[in-house]
Amino acid sequence: MFTLNENEREYRFGESGPKYLMKGPRMNFAVVRFLPGEDFQAHYHNVMEENFFILEGKVDIVVDGKKNTLSIGDFIHIEPGEVHYVKNAYDAPVKMVSALAPFQEVDKVCVENPVY
């Protein structure tokens, strides 16, 4: 058992990106923040499934070519093998929770970003 406050961790890109509160041994759990106009490279996972829950703002998550516009309170589940691309195309930051399982040290395969 452990506890931690998100302020004890830093976002990967300074003010944005993922902020991992836990990496392994069975799952990853992160708070993710994207500023207006920011995106995250399209990719898929061979083994891990990924879930996002929106805490603040609005975001587009394209899964296998289908655009999903999500806002506060929305949840999306992404299966292994489904290509997903995250973009904040809006005028305010988005903050969301990301949970991936089962934990794999290396399981991200980058692909070309979709045009939408």
Predicted region positions:
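Short strand-connecting beta-turns/loops that link adjacent beta-strands
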Residues: 25-27, 47, 91-92
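Histidine-centered metal-chelating micro-motifs
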Residues: 39-41, 60, 76, 80-86
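Conserved short histidine dyad/triad with adjacent acidic residue
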Residues: 30-45
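Glycine- and acidic-residue-biased ligand/ion/polar-headgroup-sensing regions
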Residues: 47-49, 54-59
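Well-ordered beta-strand scaffold positions
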Residues: 25-27, 58, 66
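A short, N-terminal "cap"/entry segment at the start of jelly-roll beta-barrel domains
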Residues: 1-28, 108-116
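Short acidic-glycine-tyrosine-enriched beta hairpin
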Residues: 65-80
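Ligand-binding loop in jelly-roll beta-barrel domains
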Residues: 80-106
